[in-house]
Amino acid sequence: MAGVTIEVKVDDEDVKRAFANLQSTMKNTMPVMQAIGTGLVGNIQRRLGNGVSSNVWPPLNPAYKATKRNKNILVESGALRGSISEQAGNDFVRVGTNKIYAAIHQFGGTITAKNAPALFFRLGSGFVRTKSVTIPARPFLTIEDEDERLIADIIFRFLQNKQ
């Protein structure tokens, strides 16, 4: 995943105990990790599609907003949402995207012209020429309360099925 990924350190003692229990109970925890990854991908895609998140994102530039086909901030063609994927191993789950532009949305930053004196792009009904554009951070690869519940539910379900 060349775009952006999230890593989460688990601090919740119940979840840590459940993972330790899981690893001692199961020799192969890959199915659990894959289920967690699949659940996280689904939640992130749904939040992107609905434009619903606990994160309050900065509003769009009004001129740009007027030209958007989709009312949700990080959705235009659906390519970003469709690119969210997971990788899982026996002791990890990685969720991310291979879209290079995802990083600027996740972390924010300033875009400057690389091979020209200025950036030149269409905005609204006209064109803009500027030295730089600052994109505010709009984190979409996040772990929210519903994700924490999902992770715990999956782990506990797998543990119950092993007993």
Predicted features, each with a name:
Residues M1-Q163:
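Short, Lys/Arg-rich flexible segments
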